[in-house]
């Protein structure tokens, strides 16, 4: 089922194959449903490594990660990935329509899609475009594609996360491209929209949290 009671890191270590020393060493952490967790640290401090372990993109080189008491190594990858909506700092939109980028499919729930756009405050902007949700993205590929600002792209990523509606939400440096005021507004929005979920906010700026 798509419910998460708790996630536990038990003595987790991780070392990249080419590294001389572990990035993370004997980490013990417990995260419970409904918590909002801020992970703050300098670049290279292991923040993203921790999150990729949590998401199942990396496997621990020591220790284990438990979901509701079950070792995540024994859970089928696809069903585990379904538990996460993640917005990573290096995410790029695909050269497809706005609708396809947000819903990741041709067969989608229109009402849920519109609600996700509204929550992310992009509904009016998208529907004001001549082709609306069928507008193509990525001007490098299509000359008639829409060119959204950094802040608008972040809001569309938020809409994508809202549409997936997974129990664990991860925002990895989602505001790096924004000025402090816009960043603060976006974090307040994230905080409001993540009520009832286990959410992680990763930043290298303490002010963001």
Question: How should these model regions be labeled?
Answer:
Residues 2-209:
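ABC-type nucleotide-binding domain
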